Structures are given as structure tokens and as C-alpha cells.
Amino acid sequence: MKRIDPIPKNLSPDALLRSLGITEPRDIDVEAIAYYVGLRVKRRCLKCCEAMITGLGNKGIISVNPVVMPQRERFSIAQELGHWAHHRGETVACRATDIGKFSKTNNVERAADQYAADLLMPWSMFRIECR
């Protein structure tokens, strides 16, 4: 798999999946997608959150807490991909106490959450599975 270098900012989840030729939900591998867009996934103990992303230019690292359930880990990686797609180059810090409050940080988290949902359950595939 060849990396996109650099990945366009605000690339939609559907466009990203299409560029990878992914047409089946079972083929959505968030770690492979992360690698494709210039990110590495590392598991390490995090005290204040379940996942975080740090980057410079077009490369970065998603750190994810290894003690969470696999489904939560998958969503956390997808959510950090949302930050990469929408907020790359910005300094954004979110604490656990920020979640659920109306603030600029909350809007940033909502955008990343929506990106993760659209990446993991793209409507084009999800609607077929629902029939």
C-alpha cells in the first residue's frame, strides 16, 4: 500500500475509503488506514485519555491506551484520524473534563467523533448491510 503524501486536509472518510479500494465493512482496517495517511499507531499507557495524536508536517503518531477493549481502541484510532483530517497543524488539547461541555474543544471533538463514525460505518456500506 502506497502512502498518500501529503494527504489532503479535510479528505472525507468516503473519499479515503474509495482511494484505498475499500468496499466492504470487514476491510476497514484503521491501523492500515493510519499508515496510509502518514501515521503510526503505538500502544502506550496514557493517564489522561484513551488516545492522542501528535504530528509534525505530514507524519504523526497515534498513541492509544492498550488496556481498552478492542472496539474502543478501533474507535479511538478512527477518532484520531478525524483530528488528523480536520485539525492537522492546529494545537488542540482536550481533557476528559472537556467531553460533554459546549466549547470550542467540544466542537473539535464532535467533528472527530463524526469522522470516526463515518469512517467505521460509511453510509454507502452501512445501508446495504441494513437491508
Regions found by a protein language model. Give the residues of each.
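Active-site hotspot residues in diverse enzymes, especially metal/ion-binding acidic/histidine motifs
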Residues: M1-R131
